[in-house]
Amino acid sequence: MEERNPTHDTEGRLGTVEAKVRKIVESLGEDVGYQFCNWAQANVALDDVEKPTIIYVLPPSGSFHFKWNEVLDRPNAQIAFVSPTDFDFDGTENDGIVEAMKRLCIRFVRAVNESGYFSELEDDIPYQVLYDHLDHNVTGVVISPTLVEEAGVNLCNEPERLEDD
């Protein structure tokens, strides 16, 4: 998986929430795919998915938490756990895929909690079952947690300014 934002993510420091999520997904192994996109892009990208995939959907909103020395990003995330299925799927087979994606979600949440990148996800995390929502035949679950960074942008240093060339 390539770096998505080299301006803010470096070898020594992951400066974006997306890079932290990507790193967590990478820790789950090569048998899990990863996509970072909006739902329209995911609809196209899923045409080529052949293995269970975690989709970090471009967050629609969030909040900043300002402290005396740093700012923490708290995006309202949508994270989908999907796997390909047949067009005319059997209910029992599809239920097995849903259950497998729930287990992948549990692995992901455990990895988030062990990563130290975000506050622990605990208590109730509602999910929605996903099938027949996209053009490609995938089944899975979607969660919508608020990811709270443990380390954010340092306010003691001058924030980098992006300028046009």
Show where each model-derived region lies.
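Short N-terminal edge-element motif at the start of the domain
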Residues: 43-46
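A short, hydrophobic beta-strand-centered structural micro-motif
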Residues: 49-61
